[in-house]
């Protein structure tokens, strides 16, 4: 759950300075402008693949929009050709499940039962997905209440100014961190392997650092793929594309607020129709693999820029295991992402990498006990293979 201002800049988000610019042409903003009472809902249009169900909750003070609560959840299943809705073999978005453009889930506090029915009719596990949505709505209502409590205590104008100030503060700290990188031009490239039919994809980045700003150029990156590894970034300075840079900024200064101000000092050019800026009807369920490779090429640029470097690239994308089977206790259908197998982080300049962890996600594999409780499976063992890539 995230709080964004009326200009659609993230004010606070625990994992990333996510931002989605909802200009006046946006169907979301039009919904707020035409009738401010409601909760827009979409599976298609605000994030990077269909499984990320998105809710937006307008926050008003004195009949004026001052902020927007934003929430998303990765739904375990929204239909499509396979349980879990994701397969690297998919070649078009149509195979990945329900596509629903922004529409009001609630109107004047009343549930749009037609939208709920459409969602239920397109999911293998509608009860679980609807439970996730209800949890998001509860969180968004809490955000609305807390923001209005602040407005009652300090005044709406002061709260709006504070939201803007914290974004500007993050921008200032980000520029200071970037200034620690010597001005210059740095190039790095890498490949994504293991794509269908033994295909590979080339990723290229040029990082230009000058006076506390970074300009990125991903020209030379391969065209979008007939596979599910495409990232739909909308040609913006998308957090998934530049994630390595704000990880660097937060490493240099962990007290930097995690909001859209971090991105103000970063500019990127990602050619349209490439694997990092795919266009309709590209499949993108497994887009995390390409986002991870974008992370790696930017890490390569930073390692060139800094005398002692930071760290080597990690093991790449996680292996995701999905189990679709009836619940042994209730008999109801279940679709579980039971584990994400992570190889670990690359070696650092003075120590080994972090074992069994996805550096880009800050995510570890699921404990065996949880897997056995959630499924009918018994795990014989999960082991880490020492030095499976190379020492370090």
Placement of each model-derived feature along the sequence:
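Glycine/proline-enriched, intrinsically flexible loops and inter-domain linkers
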Residues: 1-392
């Amino acid at each position: 759950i995230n709080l964004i201002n009326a200009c659609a800049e993230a004010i606070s988000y625990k994992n990333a300075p996510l931002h989605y610019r909802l200009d006046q042409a946006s169907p979301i903003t039009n919904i707020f402008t035409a009738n401010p009472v409601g909760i827009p809902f979409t599976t298609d249009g605000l994030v990077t693949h269909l499984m990320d169900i998105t809710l937006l909750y307008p926050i008003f003070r004195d009949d004026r929009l001052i902020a927007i609560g934003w929430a998303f959840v990765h739904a375990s299943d929204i239909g499509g050709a396979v349980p879990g809705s994701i397969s690297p073999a998919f070649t078009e978005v149509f195979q990945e499940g329900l596509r629903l453009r922004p529409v009001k889930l609630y109107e004047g506090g009343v549930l749009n039962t037609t939208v709920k029915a459409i969602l239920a009719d397109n999911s293998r596990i509608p009860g679980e997905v609807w439970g996730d949505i209800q949890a998001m709505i509860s969180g968004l209502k809490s955000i609305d209440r807390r923001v209005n409590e602040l407005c009652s205590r300090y005044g709406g104008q002061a709260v709006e100014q504070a939201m803007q100030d914290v974004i500007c503060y993050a921008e200032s700290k980000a520029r200071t961190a970037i200034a620690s990188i010597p001005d210059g031009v740095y190039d790095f490239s890498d490949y994504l392997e293991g794509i269908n039919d033994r295909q590979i994809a080339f990723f290229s980045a040029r990082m230009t650092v000058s006076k506390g700003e970074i300009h990125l150029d991903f020209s030379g990156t391969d065209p979008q793929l007939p596979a599910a590894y495409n990232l739909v970034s909308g040609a913006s300075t998308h957090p998934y594309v530049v994630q390595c840079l704000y990880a660097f900024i937060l490493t240099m200064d962990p007290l930097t607020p995690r909001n859209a101000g971090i991105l103000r000092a970063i500019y990127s050019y990602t050619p349209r129709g490439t694997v990092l800026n795919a266009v309709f009807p590209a499949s993108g369920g497994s887009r995390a693999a390409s986002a991870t490779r974008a992370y790696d090429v930017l890490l390569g640029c930073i390692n060139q820029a800094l005398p002692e470097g930071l760290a080597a690239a990690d093991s790449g994308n996680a292996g995701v295991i999905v189990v679709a089977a009836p619940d042994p206790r209730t008999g109801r259908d279940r679709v579980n992402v039971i584990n994400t197998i992570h190889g670990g982080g690359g070696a650092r300049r003075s120590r080994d990498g972090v074992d069994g962890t996805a550096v880009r996600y800050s995510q570890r594999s699921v404990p065996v006990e949880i897997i056995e409780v959630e499924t009918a499976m018994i795990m014989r063992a999960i082991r880490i293979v020492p030095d499976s890539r190379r020492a370090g």
